[in-house]
């Protein structure tokens, strides 16, 4: 998600920049890594392509915005981590204003495709 630093304007606005609207954070991130790699003398081309692939495939599926599906184990692991991170952030947001002792159902969430509530575990 390194490309988000260029995709979005500074806080508190967090609006999309022109570059963000046109290219998106995935492409911007791959370009940023490519530019940095070019400054490292002797950096292996194969590894550079593998790193850029991981960035391009980190959303995991074409319908989620990735221009490529993961074709490397590392890219697949990164896409899983990105997916779990997004889902856990959604849960955190759901429970932000819910008291810790509230174990009532919070309603259906489209991203999680589930009705959600806190567990009773302490």
Model-derived features with residue positions:
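Divalent metal-dependent catalytic cores for phosphoryl transfer on phosphate-bearing substrates
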Residues: 1-98
């Amino acid at each position: 998600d390194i490309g988000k630093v260029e995709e979005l304007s500074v806080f508190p606005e967090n609006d999309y920049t022109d570059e963000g609207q046109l290219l998106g954070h995935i492409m911007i991130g791959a370009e940023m890594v490519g530019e940095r790699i070019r400054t490292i003398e002797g950096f292996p081309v194969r590894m550079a392509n593998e790193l850029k692939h991981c960035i391009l495939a980190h959303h995991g599926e074409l319908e989620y915005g990735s221009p490529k599906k993961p074709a490397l184990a590392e890219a697949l692991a990164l896409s899983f981590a990105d997916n779990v991170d997004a889902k856990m952030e959604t849960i955190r947001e759901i429970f932000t204003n819910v008291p810790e002792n509230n174990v009532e159902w919070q309603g259906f969430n489209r991203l999680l495709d589930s009705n959600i509530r806190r567990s009773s575990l302490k």
